[in-house]
């Protein structure tokens, strides 16, 4: 069989014959959806997708594995705050009991259910530990919601950049020494905000970073959205609560069997103003929280509490076998780092005759394997306890088969190191200005941005309002635009709105 991609024709060798799967693919393809002309509902599309044999190497963590979850959701239990069913915003009954169970499982002092995703947890945490105009130390590879909190509270960010691993092409961990240096140089910093693990699975030394923050008598907030499974098996790192973080945010839906949009915020025994964090949770979360989503979190916690070892042990066995098999790749390469979340599978295409976007298309179109993300020189596959042995073997064998059809090729590496920028004004100051104009990318160099620009996923800003646009920023944007990626956040294509300081 021959797969024709945008840049290259790849002959797929092996004994795969035409199957019903391939025939169904011809009549059902995500790319053929026409939302404007179709009368189908979102549910209709979801129903059709559920009947196909597409297997998801991506979140959410339940992986549509209904057999694992011993319950039936959702319409019959989709209620509101009626008698005996408690209230998320003033929990003192069944919701409080459920949150206390989650706190015990995660070794936290206090846990709150989030039905607006990790985003609302990050916003509430940052705004809860800072006051207007405060300084905050922020890892530059944090999610865009961190930058939105900075804007909302008119904060002055001090950035710490992650290491860049030239060998793997990944933005690495945040160095403890860098954080120590910046805290010593900026004594007015009121909090530290990092992301660990990153979208790619890189883990920072949260324990030592927490110790440094506490020496300076300030709290550490950890966006551990992608590490909701941490601490439940020795194959994975301890979670950030166990490592001394003051506030931790988990996206339960990303790597555990819970519905999309579900998350947790944990607060630990520190000097954090808990009332203020709770106040922002009440302000920013929906006043009509979904009981289906809350039930999903609670069912997930109960499953881990009662059957944690039963579900994690075979899952870890499958992961170890996968990594062993993928170590046999000749041209594609399974990326490994010293501090890594082994539930993630980063497959590098460096020095092969195929691009990451080509690989993603082959996996999707021929093998019906949908990846989580394509970025730079690699594709990212996410696994979770909801994965089946058969699904993971299918992913492994597809990569091995594709690998046999490839050859070596020296090619220009795709640059992923975050460009360094200079903060000239607070984002809140710039975004409140009315005077601005749109410039072409090249013309904008040296000017101050009034817009965010980022690739999504993972949602890490390349440029933030108030930062000076550099040649490196524009080179970064141009490279990804030429590779076919969508640059989000910019109002006008290939232009940036800049501040006119008159």
Predicted regions and their residues:
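Ser/Thr-rich, low-complexity intrinsically disordered segments
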Residues: 1-15
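Intrinsically disordered, low-complexity segments enriched in serine/proline and basic residues
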Residues: 14, 18, 24-32
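N-terminal "arm"/small-domain region of PLP-dependent enzymes with the aminotransferase-like
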Residues: 34-93
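Conserved PLP-enzyme active-site core in the AAT-like
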Residues: 42-49, 68-69, 90, 118-336
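Conserved N-terminal alpha-helix of the aminotransferase class I/II PLP-enzyme fold
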Residues: 75-117
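Generic structural marker for isolated residues within well-ordered, non-membrane alpha-helices
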Residues: 99, 237, 360
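Conserved C-terminal alpha-helix-loop-beta "cap" of PLP-dependent enzymes
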Residues: 324-489
């Amino acid at each position: 069989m021959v797969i024709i991609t945008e840049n290259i024709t790849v002959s797929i060798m092996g004994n795969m014959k035409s199957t019903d799967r391939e025939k169904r693919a011809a009549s059902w393809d995500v790319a053929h959806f026409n939302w404007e002309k179709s009368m189908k509902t979102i549910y209709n599309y979801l129903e059709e997708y559920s009947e196909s044999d597409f297997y998801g190497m991506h979140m959410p963590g339940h992986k549509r594995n209904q057999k694992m979850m011993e319950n039936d959701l959702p319409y019959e239990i989709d209620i509101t705050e009626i008698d005996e069913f408690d209230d998320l915003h003033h929990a003192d009954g069944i919701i409080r009991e459920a949150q206390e169970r989650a706190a015990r499982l995660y070794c936290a002092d206090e846990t709150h259910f989030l039905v607006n995703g990790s985003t609302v947890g990050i916003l509430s945490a940052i705004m809860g530990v800072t006051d207007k105009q405060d300084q905050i130390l922020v890892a530059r590879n944090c999610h865009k919601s961190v930058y939105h909190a900075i804007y909302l509270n008119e904060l002055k960010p001090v950035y710490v950049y992650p290491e860049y691993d030239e060998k793997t092409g990944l933005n690495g961990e945040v160095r403890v020494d860098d954080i120590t240096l910046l805290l010593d140089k900026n004594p007015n910093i009121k909090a530290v905000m990092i992301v660990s693990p990153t979208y790619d699975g890189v883990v920072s030394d949260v324990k030592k970073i927490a110790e440094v923050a506490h020496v300076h008598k300030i709290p550490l907030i950890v966006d551990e959205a992608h590490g909701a499974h941490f601490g439940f098996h020795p194959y994975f790192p301890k979670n950030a609560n166990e490592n001394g973080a003051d506030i931790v945010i988990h996206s339960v839906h990303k790597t555990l069997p819970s519905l999309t949009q579900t998350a947790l915020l944990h607060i630990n025994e520190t000097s954090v103003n808990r009332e203020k964090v709770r106040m922002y949770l009440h302000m920013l979360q929906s006043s009509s929280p979904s009981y289906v989503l809350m039930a999903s979190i609670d069912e997930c916690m109960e499953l881990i509490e009662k059957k944690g070892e039963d579900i994690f042990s075979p899952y870890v066995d499958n992961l170890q076998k996968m990594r062993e098999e993928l170590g046999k790749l000749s041209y594609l390469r399974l990326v490994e780092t010293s501090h890594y979340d082994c539930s993630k599978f980063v497959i590098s295409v460096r020095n092969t005759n195929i691009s990451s976007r080509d690989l993603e298309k082959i996996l999707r179109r021929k093998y019906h394997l949908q990846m989580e993300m394509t970025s730079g020189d690699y594709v990212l596959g996410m696994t979770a306890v909801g994965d089946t042995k058969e699904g993971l073997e299918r992913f492994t064998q597809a990569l091995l088969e594709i690998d046999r059809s490839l050859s070596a090729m020296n090619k220009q590496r795709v640059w992923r190191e975050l460009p360094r920028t200079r903060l000239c004004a607070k984002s809140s100051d710039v975004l409140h200005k009315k005077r601005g104009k749109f410039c072409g990318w090249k013309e904008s160099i040296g000017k101050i941005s009034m817009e965010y620009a980022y690739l999504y996923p993972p949602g890490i800003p390349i440029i933030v309002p108030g930062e000076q646009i550099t040649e490196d920023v524009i080179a970064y944007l141009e490279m990804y635009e030429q590779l076919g990626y969508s640059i989000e956040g910019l109002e006008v294509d290939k232009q940036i709105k800049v501040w006119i300081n008159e």
